[in-house]
């Protein structure tokens, strides 16, 4: 028999005839009563307590164990949805029904929710796979799992690696997204079917999948092709020279990549027809299998149209070729049919059902849940100036630099880091040089070795990848909305795909991408209820602005800037 008491809340359970019998106050029971069916629960007796005979309902056991664990942990990071999430994950494991959970950007950044799904995975009687990045795996192995193992009635084998341990393995396997997807997309999937799988951090799932499906030809692969066809070296070299000539005639862009043109496709196709297919190196065989799909645009359906691009290194005179599908849903939909999955993300979409995310990834029948943010503990202070020029006007850069300098000066004496997010590469360098001339070594461009009151100037990608190792900023300045730039050839290629399909490319692609990026970028500021200055007036001058502002809730709007906003006293008052 097991028992746990917290104040007046006593919970006990024991096995009786292979069934779990639970006794606990109604106040504790109420939280998970709605998840149990009449077949699961038999009310037995008592006015003050309810005695349940539960037929192996894992939700109840997880709820009660985690409830006692959380009450026993002094100073444990509070999150009001621990028990709800643990029950939903446990229910998905029991029923074999997939689920999609949005925990919110603030919670996603802090990672507090992981206690919930780890508890369910440890207490589940069968094998479970957890797909998470290497960094998250280390956090689970060193912190979350040992802490729970000391309390929960579970003794589960835990393994890490890229392959399934053994046919009779009944433990918990931690695996990276790349290794898991590689196995799932392989012709001979090394993972058994029907293994419940929890995927953490699915905000990046689409990028993970597309990366796994990308075929690449690197400069050294041309040497391998020449070795495979010693009598046709000149033919291969001539095709490479033609491609180099055409690619290096393209005007430079900040992204160093270019969509492949029809004439360049013809060069590759002509080379392919001149070679004996049976002797092709594997990497070339895989790559050339895609070329027939893009030779004739008129014969390719919009849903099958791929991205085909090149990156170039001008100084070295080298180029690489890449192919990746745009539409992923049909390719990966079979994965979700092979095993039940629990997908956990931060802020995928404003809607609980995340319809666009599910459509892009072929997710049909899933239980969807979205947790609300803490309206008091996670609220940011948002400043949006009304009179700044729009980003696409000549006056914008000068006005932006003046506004950034004003903000930095106002907060100069306040403790805490300042982060300035600028997506435009030349503008980022210019702002960095101007601020460094005034504030000296406090200013760094995309470096992590900052002082306590340092000023970091960063692009969106650098900030996303490094915010977990940096202190939460007191002030976050955002130059423009992170709408993917149409000047990026890869973005332009995806937009062209939506246009060919007669779809609203802005509301289906650019806007959701920007909203997700924005919420994740702001998440660290919520830790100390800091200030976010959004200097892109499109949020007040465009119809979609209200949708963006709504996605940033909870927030308090600031109509003016004053040094007192950055004072310690003001911070204490806000808390």
Roles of regions detected by a PLM:
Residues 2-5, 9-13, 32-84, 88-106, ...:
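Conserved coupling segment at the C-terminus of the helicase ATP-binding
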Residues 25-27:
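Short polybasic linear motifs
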Residues 100-150:
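Conserved Walker A/P-loop ATP-binding site and its immediately adjacent core
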Residues 130-131, 173-176, 196-199, 340-345, ...:
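Structural recognition of the conserved hydrophobic beta-strand(s) that form the central parallel beta-sheet
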Residues 132, 149-162, 365-369, 419, ...:
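Conserved RecA-like helicase motor-core motifs
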Residues 159-196, 206-209, 456-467:
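Conserved RecA-like ASCE ATPase "motif II neighborhood" in helicase/translocase motors
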